[in-house]
Structure formats: structure tokens, C-alpha cells
């Protein structure tokens, strides 16, 4: 059983820790925090060994009466791999200043740039490329969702051009500092947005074939994508079948009352999901259409959780624990209780 250190027990880190803890071939050897907040206290309550991410701040945890095992320097060399959950730009610095120094493999998250790691990971597309590598970037929630859907489409036809409009949530539910509250913001105002090139970092054959634009709207629950994908030839039934066969994608029906991101979140709550996480992306079945070989569909992405199962598969790939990506996906899905 391999040992995983989660460096940064925040929005992504705490979910990764819980996901690792559910696997039978890996374990959490520790988690880190930069400050003694409620998440640090919760980590200890849940049984995780807590370490100070910044050694000079260890005393703050002691002063706050939060049990602390030491600093990251005391645990990192016991780790087979580190999952970095730090804010963007910090992950890159951690690779250069911490992980390479201690000769430990690491996964950084999608806030970093593709050039900051050896490759970009998605369980369906780049598992084999990342097999045995030392420093891998796990792409963002939006890119992860797009890669899954484009995988389904690519399995049945050739993609000539993909156009995507991303409607992004303004902030996570616990974020009181980010907006907007009463505006719609082109972000970026230029086209393409960074999402297209990010998809290409995972799927090189789509270079020159994907165009994305993005806006931010005042909601916290989920992102939404509208896809228009030109193909060499396809039917609606074939698209429906491909989506059904692709892991970590579910179809939802507006006709059954799931007609908004709010209803998708309510559905996730009713599934009994911790933190109402929906690791699967949700495609509205009624939105799927094919006109003149061009596929149209709309999908929703739970930005806090869709990348979590990918982190687990990435651990297996980098540590050469399972050669077959589909077997890893199925193993992860079973452990996490995913729908498919």
C-alpha cells in the first residue's frame, strides 16, 4: 500500500484525502495546512495526521491547541507521492523548492501551467503517457469535463472542430471574497480562452480544432458548457450510446425536474454525497442533438469535485500500480461509489 501526502488540505486537498482513504491500495500518511483554521481542526478530527506546510508557522497550531505532528519536512520523505492542493502558482514553486529537493513524485493541480509539469493528466486520454512520470499536472475541472465528453465523441467519429462556450461559476460556495455579485464578465474578454489550449495539452490531436470562450456569472454551484462539435458523420443515437458507455458522465433529464444546476446539486444531495459532490459530469439528455453531422449538447461541471477521481487514477499511473487505465477508473469508481 502506497503512502500519499496531501500538501494543502483545502477545497481539493480534503476531497483527495477522503478519496485516497477509501481506496484499498493507498493510504493518507499526512495532510498539511498553512494556518490553524477549522479545516485543520477537522482534519485531525477525521483522523488524519496534520503537519505544518510552512515550518515557521508550526507554533501557530500549537498556540491554537490543534494537535500537530510536525512540519512537512518531517513527513515528506515517507511519502511515495504528494498530491499538491496549494493555490495556483504555489504548486509550481513547491515542485522546484520542495518535491525535487526531497526526490518525491508529485501531482500539481490545474491552476498551474502545462509547462510546469512533465505532462497533463486525464484518466481517459493521457494515463499511459503519465505512467511512471515524476511530476504531473492534473488539469482543471473545466478541462477534465471537456476531455470526458470529447472522449465519448471521439470514440464514435472524427472531430473536425469543437466550439465551446463556458459559463463559469463566480466563486466556490465558501468564498466570500470573489465575485461578481451583480454582473456577467467575459473572462477572458479575448477568444480563445485558455481552456482550448488546456484541452490540447491532454489531447494533442485537437490542436487547431477547438475554440473556447468563457464568461463568469454570479453563481457558486457549478460551471456549465455549451458544446458544438463538427464531425465527419454521426447520429444522435450513437452520441447517446457513447455517452452512456463513457465513465464519469451521467445523463440527466429536465423533463424529470433536473432543469438547472441547482436541481443537479439537489440530486447529488439526495444521492447522499458528502459535501454534495458530483464527481461525474452531468449532460442534459434533451440538449443532445445532431444537425448536419454537428453535435450539440449542454453539460454541468461540479468544480469542487470532478477532478477528484482523476487524482486517484493519476497516483496509480505515476506509481505504476496499474497499467490499464480502465481498470484503474473502475476501481476508483467502485471505491468512491460513483454512478458510472
UniProtKB/Swiss-Prot annotation:
Give its E.C. classification number: 1.2.1.59
Q: What class of enzyme is it?
A: oxidoreductase
Q: Where are the transmembrane segments?
A: none
Entry superkingdom? Archaea
Give binding positions for NAD(+): 11-12, 111, 169, 303
Location of the active site: 141
> Which amino acid positions bind D-glyceraldehyde 3-phosphate, per UniProt?
140-142, 195-196
Q: Which molecular function terms from Gene Ontology are attached?
A: glyceraldehyde-3-phosphate dehydrogenase (NAD+) (phosphorylating) activity; glyceraldehyde-3-phosphate dehydrogenase (NADP+) (phosphorylating) activity; NAD binding; NADP binding
Q: Which Gene3D superfamilies match?
A: Dihydrodipicolinate Reductase, domain 2, NAD(P)-binding Rossmann-like Domain
Q: Which reaction does it catalyse?
A: D-glyceraldehyde 3-phosphate + phosphate + NADP(+) = (2R)-3-phospho-glyceroyl phosphate + NADPH + H(+); D-glyceraldehyde 3-phosphate + phosphate + NAD(+) = (2R)-3-phospho-glyceroyl phosphate + NADH + H(+)
- Pfam families for this protein: Gp_dh_C
Keywords linked to the UniProt accession: Cytoplasm, Glycolysis, NAD, NADP, Oxidoreductase
Biological process terms in GO annotation: glycolytic process
Give the UniProt entry's GO cellular component terms.
cytoplasm
Question: What pathway is this protein said to act in by its record?
Answer: Carbohydrate degradation; glycolysis; pyruvate from D-glyceraldehyde 3-phosphate: step 1/5
**Where is the protein situated, by its record's location annotation?**
Cytoplasm
Q: Which family does it belong to?
A: Belongs to the glyceraldehyde-3-phosphate dehydrogenase family.
Assembly information from the UniProt record: Homotetramer.
The family database entries (HAMAP family) matched by this protein are listed as: G3P_dehdrog_arch
The protein in question is named Glyceraldehyde-3-phosphate dehydrogenase
| Source species | Methanococcus vannielii (strain ATCC 35089 / DSM 1224 / JCM 13029 / OCM 148 / SB)
Q: What is the lineage of its organism?
A: Archaea, Methanobacteriati, Methanobacteriota, Methanomada group, Methanococci
Amino acid at each position: 500500500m502506497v503512502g500519499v501526502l496531501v500538501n494543502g488540505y483545502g477545497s481539493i486537498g480534503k476531497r483527495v484525502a477522503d478519496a485516497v482513504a477509501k481506496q484499498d491500495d493507498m493510504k493518507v500518511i499526512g495532510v498539511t495546512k498553512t494556518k490553524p483554521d477549522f479545516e485543520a481542526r477537522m482534519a485531525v478530527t477525521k483522523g488524519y495526521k496534520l503537519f505544518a506546510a510552512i515550518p515557521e508557522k508550526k507554533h501557530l497550531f500549537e498556540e491554537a491547541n490543534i494537535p500537530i505532528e510536525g512540519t512537512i519536512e518531517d513527513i515528506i520523505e515517507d511519502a511515495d507521492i504528494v498530491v499538491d492542493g496549494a493555490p495556483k502558482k504555489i504548486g509550481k514553486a513547491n515542485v522546484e523548492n520542495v518535491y525535487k529537493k526531497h526526490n518525491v513524485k508529485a501531482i500539481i493541480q490545474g491552476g498551474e501551467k502545462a509547462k510546469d509539469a512533465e505532462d497533463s493528466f486525464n484518466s481517459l486520454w493521457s494515463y499511459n503517457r503519465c505512467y511512471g512520470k515524476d511530476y504531473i499536472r492534473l488539469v482543471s475541472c473545466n478541462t477534465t469535463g471537456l476531455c470526458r465528453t470529447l472522449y465519448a465523441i471521439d470514440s464514435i467519429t472524427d472531430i473536425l472542430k469543437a466550439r465551446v462556450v463556458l459559463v463559469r461559476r463566480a466563486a466556490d460556495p465558501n468564498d466570500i471574497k470573489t465575485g461578481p455579485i451583480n454582473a456577467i464578465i467575459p473572462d477572458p474578454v479575448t477568444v480563445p480562452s485558455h481552456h482550448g489550449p488546456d484541452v490540447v495539452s491532454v489531447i494533442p490531436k485537437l490542436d487547431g480544432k477547438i475554440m473556447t470562450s468563457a464568461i463568469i456569472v454570479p453563481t457558486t454551484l457549478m460551471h456549465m458548457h455549451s458544446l458544438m462539435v463538427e464531425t465527419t458523420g454521426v447520429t444522435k443515437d450513437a452520441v447517446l450510446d457513447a455517452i452512456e458507455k463513457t465513465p464519469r458522465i451521467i445523463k440527466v433529464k429536465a423533463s424529470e425536474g433536473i432543469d438547472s444546476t441547482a436541481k443537479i446539486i439537489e440530486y447529488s444531495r439526495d444521492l447522499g454525497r458528502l459535501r454534495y459532490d458530483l464527481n461525474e459530469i452531468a449532460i442534459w439528455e434533451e440538449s443532445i442533438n445532431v444537425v448536419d453531422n454537428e453535435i450539440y449538447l449542454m453539460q454541468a461541471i461540479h468544480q469542487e469535485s470532478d477532478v477528484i477521481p482523476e487524482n486517484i487514477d493519476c497516483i496509480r499511473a505515476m506509481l505504476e500500480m496499474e497499467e490499464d487505465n480502465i481498470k484503474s477508473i473502475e476501481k476508483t469508481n467502485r471505491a468512491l461509489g460513483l454512478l458510472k
